[in-house]
C-alpha cells in the first residue's frame, strides 16, 4: 500500500514519522492514521491531494480569519469553506419616508405685506395717534409718564414677582461678585483649618522636646508593661490610655497648653499697649505709687474720637494737683519699667549696658550673627513648633 517507507527522505515535509493530522505542516495533508483514502493511505505521495501552493489561498472561513485548513475534506469545497471571500453589492439606501408617503417640501412663507397688509399700514403716525387714547397710553407709559424723553418701561408681572426692589431692565446680578463673595469665606475657613491642625501639633512637638531634655541620648522606648493591660513598646510621647505613662503625658501637655495661652496673653497685652489701648497712669518722679483721692482723675481726653484718656492727675505730698500725660504708646511697658527700676536699682545699669551695645552696633551684629550660626539649628528645632502662631500674631498686629 503506497510507496515503500524505506526510501530515505529529508526535511520536515519528507519525514513520515511526524504526525500531521490537519495538514498544517509543509507537504503533509492527513496522517495515514485517519485513512482518508483507502487506496493510498500514504498521503505524502497521494496524487489526489490538493497541492500545497493552493493551501496558501486561505481567508475567512469556519475557523475564523486566516484559520481555514488547506483542504476541503472537513468543511466542504464551497468558496466560504475554502476561505474565498465573495464581495456582494451593497443595497442602495432606502428612500426618504416623506418622499414615499407623498409629502412635499414645506413652501416658503409669503411675505408679511401679502399676508397681513393691515400691519404694514401701522406707521409712526398711526402709532402716535393711537397714543392719544388713554387706554392705549396706559399700556405703554406708567402713571405720570409722558411720551417724550427717557421713559421707564412698564412693569411686568415677572419683574414684580421675581424682585420687588429691582426694576425691569435693571442690570443683572454679577456672578463674579457672587462667586468671590462665596470663595472669600471658604479661603478663610481653609486657612483657619490649616493653622488649627498645625497648632494642634504644637503640644506633641513640645512634649517631644521636653522629654528629650531628660534623655540626651535620644528618646527611650516606653515598655508600657502593665499587669492589667500590657501594651507594646512605644515612645513616651505617644502613650496609649492603657499605659502607666499616659497620665504623665497628659500632665505635660496640659502645662504646655497653659504656656501657650500665657504666650498668647502676653502678645495680646503687648499689642494693646503698642496701640495705646492701655491708659496706665505713670509713676511720679521720686515716688513709687500715685496717691488716691478725688484729684486722681483724668482731666482731658485724647485728641479725636478716642475713648482713652490722655493724662492723669496725681496729688503729691505738697497738696497741689499735677497732671501727668499718659504716653500714647507703651504706657503699660513704661509703667512696669518705672516700677521695676524703683524696686531694683541695678536695672539702671542694664540701661547703660544696652546703650553701650547700641553704640557698638557693628560688633553687636557680628556677635548676633555668630550666635545664630552656632545655635541656629538648635534654636530652629526648638522654635519650629511655634511657627504656626506667627501668621496669627502678624495678622493681629496689622489688623488691630
Curated annotation (Swiss-Prot):
<keyword id="KW-1168">Fusion of virus membrane with host membrane</keyword>
<feature type="transmembrane region" description="Helical; Name=TM2">
    <location>
        <begin position="254"/>
        <end position="274"/>
    </location>
</feature>
<dbReference type="GO" id="GO:0055036">
    <property type="term" value="C:virion membrane"/>
</dbReference>
<keyword id="KW-0812">Transmembrane</keyword>
<keyword id="KW-0449">Lipoprotein</keyword>
<feature type="topological domain" description="Intravirion">
    <location>
        <begin position="370"/>
        <end position="375"/>
    </location>
</feature>
<keyword id="KW-0945">Host-virus interaction</keyword>
<feature type="compositionally biased region" description="Polar residues">
    <location>
        <begin position="96"/>
        <end position="109"/>
    </location>
</feature>
<keyword id="KW-1162">Viral penetration into host cytoplasm</keyword>
<feature type="topological domain" description="Virion surface">
    <location>
        <begin position="275"/>
        <end position="348"/>
    </location>
</feature>
<keyword id="KW-0325">Glycoprotein</keyword>
<feature type="glycosylation site" description="N-linked (GlcNAc...) asparagine; by host">
    <location>
        <position position="320"/>
    </location>
</feature>
<feature type="region of interest" description="Pre-S">
    <location>
        <begin position="2"/>
        <end position="174"/>
    </location>
</feature>
<keyword id="KW-0946">Virion</keyword>
<keyword id="KW-1164">Virus endocytosis by host</keyword>
<comment type="function">
    <text>The large envelope protein exists in two topological conformations, one which is termed 'external' or Le-HBsAg and the other 'internal' or Li-HBsAg. In its external conformation the protein attaches the virus to cell receptors and thereby initiating infection. This interaction determines the species specificity and liver tropism. This attachment induces virion internalization predominantly through caveolin-mediated endocytosis. The large envelope protein also assures fusion between virion membrane and endosomal membrane.</text>
</comment>
<keyword id="KW-1133">Transmembrane helix</keyword>
<feature type="transmembrane region" description="Helical; Name=TM1; Note=In external conformation">
    <location>
        <begin position="182"/>
        <end position="202"/>
    </location>
</feature>
<protein>
    <recommendedName>
        <fullName>Large envelope protein</fullName>
    </recommendedName>
</protein>
<keyword id="KW-1166">Caveolin-mediated endocytosis of virus by host</keyword>
<dbReference type="GO" id="GO:0039654">
    <property type="term" value="P:fusion of virus membrane with host endosome membrane"/>
</dbReference>
<keyword id="KW-0472">Membrane</keyword>
<keyword id="KW-1160">Virus entry into host cell</keyword>
<feature type="transmembrane region" description="Helical; Name=TM3">
    <location>
        <begin position="376"/>
        <end position="398"/>
    </location>
</feature>
<keyword id="KW-1161">Viral attachment to host cell</keyword>
<feature type="topological domain" description="Intravirion; in internal conformation">
    <location>
        <begin position="2"/>
        <end position="253"/>
    </location>
</feature>
<feature type="topological domain" description="Virion surface">
    <location>
        <begin position="399"/>
        <end position="400"/>
    </location>
</feature>
<dbReference type="GO" id="GO:0019031">
    <property type="term" value="C:viral envelope"/>
</dbReference>
<comment type="function">
    <text>The middle envelope protein plays an important role in the budding of the virion. It is involved in the induction of budding in a nucleocapsid independent way. In this process the majority of envelope proteins bud to form subviral lipoprotein particles of 22 nm of diameter that do not contain a nucleocapsid.</text>
</comment>
<feature type="region of interest" description="Disordered">
    <location>
        <begin position="84"/>
        <end position="110"/>
    </location>
</feature>
<comment type="similarity">
    <text>Belongs to the orthohepadnavirus major surface antigen family.</text>
</comment>
<feature type="topological domain" description="Virion surface; in external conformation">
    <location>
        <begin position="2"/>
        <end position="181"/>
    </location>
</feature>
<dbReference type="GO" id="GO:0075513">
    <property type="term" value="P:caveolin-mediated endocytosis of virus by host cell"/>
</dbReference>
<feature type="lipid moiety-binding region" description="N-myristoyl glycine; by host">
    <location>
        <position position="2"/>
    </location>
</feature>
<feature type="topological domain" description="Intravirion; in external conformation">
    <location>
        <begin position="203"/>
        <end position="253"/>
    </location>
</feature>
<feature type="transmembrane region" description="Helical">
    <location>
        <begin position="349"/>
        <end position="369"/>
    </location>
</feature>
<keyword id="KW-1170">Fusion of virus membrane with host endosomal membrane</keyword>
<dbReference type="GO" id="GO:0016020">
    <property type="term" value="C:membrane"/>
</dbReference>
<keyword id="KW-0007">Acetylation</keyword>
<dbReference type="InterPro" id="IPR000349">
    <property type="entry name" value="HBV_HBSAG"/>
</dbReference>
<feature type="region of interest" description="Pre-S2">
    <location>
        <begin position="120"/>
        <end position="174"/>
    </location>
</feature>
<keyword id="KW-0261">Viral envelope protein</keyword>
